Amino acid sequence: MTEPAYYNRSLDQGLKQFLSNANDMVSELKNDGYRISDSCRFSVFIKKLSNFIENGFEIGDRQFDIALLAEGSRDFAELRAIVKSKTVRQKNRKEIQKIFGGSGKPSDDTLTQSRDFQFELYLAAIFDLSGFYVSIIEPDFLFKYEEVTYSVAAKRINSEQKIHTRFSKAKKQIKKSGINGFIAFSLDRIVWDKMKKDPYIITNNLDTLYNAGQTILHDLLKTKVKKAAWANRDPLVVGHIASLTIPAILARSISFGFSSNQLFIPSFDISEKSKIYRHIKELPQKIKWPIKSQ
């Protein structure tokens, strides 16, 4: 595969401010008519975080599930983008309602639909909040750059064995739309499973977030992902967007960290002299989310 163009942004936020924002998001969604039960993973996270703060637990305390907190912080960081995006909110009411299912940790999910929808909506929200014109239609959404419209089929991949299957389905969706498009895919679950670690890191330096999982990510891109991309070549599939989101606990400041990574990769047959190739290389520079002030 062609060398990817990167977008990466890492942010952190104190636990009390994060909790306040999480409560505000849930209240806003409930007021808008969404059903969010006390047993929902987002509600459970709020209870766990409140308990953590009130009881003065420390990072590494064995009586507290830090992995659950870290995963919840990633869920809320992604939900924040979805809530902020008017385009996504207006067009995806049924899909947004479905993301409130699922378990606190992805490894405990028996069904993946909730987090699958979460990734699709989160990616669409990123483009919308970055100033792109976004339409929520098949395959998953469209965006426009320099008056050129691209389609996106977004797939969350839960195992290496499913990479080819998910790419094949995405290709069919793009072909059905008839619009040049990207196969976008989340490798969060695969990367962390291969690391054989909890889905977070503890650090005092936000810069280390960028390096977490990068070796495994690039190995996947050069092997299993490259093989699946080659097998699913099509004139309408002009590129791929690899996504990796990393939650962290910043021990010294007792805060949550969050690193959002998107890698834009031109397809094999795209000429380096073409407008499409230039667009793919420029797109990471146009992504503006997450923004700390929001």
Segments from the language model and where they lie:
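Compositionally biased, intrinsically disordered low-complexity regions enriched in proline and serine
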Residues: 7-8, 133, 146, 151, ...
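Conserved catalytic cores of phosphodiester-cleaving nucleases, focusing on short active-site segments
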Residues: 127, 141-143, 147-160
